[in-house]
Swiss-Prot record:
It is found in: Secreted. It comes from Oxyopes takobius. This is Spiderine-1a. One of its GO terms (biological process) is defense response to bacterium. Keywords: Antibiotic, Antimicrobial, Cytolysis, Disulfide bond, Knottin, Secreted, Signal, Toxin. PROSITE patterns: OXYTX_ICK. Belongs to the spiderine family. Cationic/spiderine subfamily. Expressed by the venom gland. It comes from the Eukaryota. Residues 113-166 form the Oxytoxin-type inhibitor cystine knot (ICK) domain.
Length: 166
């Protein structure tokens, strides 16, 4: 609550200062209202704000929040005992770990830093992938955040354009 009032005060102060050149366009009553709002914020004692926050916390229905959390916990515990769910979770964790870390394997010839990444691993260019693979970007250069580039098997129309390591 304090933060919101301070932020409102800073914004109002900024607006008042920023509109100094535009006073002719704004009506005097609007500027007066902004100034009164700033004065009101400055006059409000912090103790009353803390009391308001405490009152809001007392009115909040904590029991409902705790019962909802307890229900979610019980559902999660029940799901964790399901064998199919355990298998799917284990597979998902392993897949995420492999995609994130990038599995290394022995390259046919040295490329870039003498390491190359497994198929499906995120890459930035062909030098990240093995010589027999290439870096494929489905979204091109315009949206790499949504569709990541990955190392793929080199086909007849695609080639690894990374120069051989010296």
């Amino acid at each position: 609550m304090k933060f919101a009032l301070v932020l409102l005060g800073v914004c109002a102060f900024y607006l008042v200062n920023a509109t100094g050149d535009l006073e002719t366009e704004l009506e005097a009553s609007e500027l007066q209202e902004l100034q009164e709002a700033l004065d009101l914020i400055g006059e409000t004692p912090l103790e009353s704000l803390e009391a308001e926050e405490l009152e809001e916390a007392r009115k909040f229905k904590w029991g409902k929040l705790f019962s909802t959390a307890k229900k979610l916990y019980k559902k999660g515990k029940k799901l964790s005992k399901n064998k199919n769910f355990k298998k799917a979770l284990k597979f998902g964790k392993q897949l995420a770990k492999n995609l994130q870390a990038g599995e290394e394997h022995e390259p046919g010839t040295p490329v870039g830093n003498n390491k190359c990444w497994a198929i499906g691993t995120t890459c930035s260019d062909d030098c990240d992938c093995c010589p027999e693979h290439h870096c494929h970007c489905p979204a091109g250069k315009w949206l790499p955040g949504l569709f990541r580039c990955t190392c793929q098997v080199t086909e007849s129309d695609k080639v690894n354009k990374c120069p051989p390591a010296e």
